[in-house]
Amino acid sequence: MADVTTVADDEAQIRALIQAWADAVRTKDVNAVMRHYASDVVVFDVMPPLFVQGAEPYRCNWQDWFDALEGPADFQFVDLHLAVSGDLAYCFSVNRLRARYRDGTKHDAQTRATVCWRKIDGRWLVVHEHASVPMPVPESIAA
């Protein structure tokens, strides 16, 4: 018999996965972070390079960033929206991240994120992630 779930079930599963991902970021657990990504994920991150294709290269980005931090990260969703339809889902959010780098520099930033999920072999996995920060513009064009 096929696994039949309701949209509410899928939404609850994804919300639990999102929370587990955030907990893994807070504790800098790269293995737990990477459990959420499809092997062929495409990521547009706020840090170079312009994009990353594949979970293994993205793992390196996470590990390098975690290694640069002193202590845990304070990560919070300021606003999170989720929609599910069939085997696809997306969420978007504004996120707040506070951390301290090993050189003593403090990091306190808000980012915008869009994450696309696909149910693959019964598991919800991230297939695309896009994070961005507002870009400063000259005052003459800022409305």
Enumerate the predicted regions with their spans.
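A beta-strand edge to alpha-helix "cap/lid" segment located at domain peripheries
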Residues: A2-R35, V42-A143
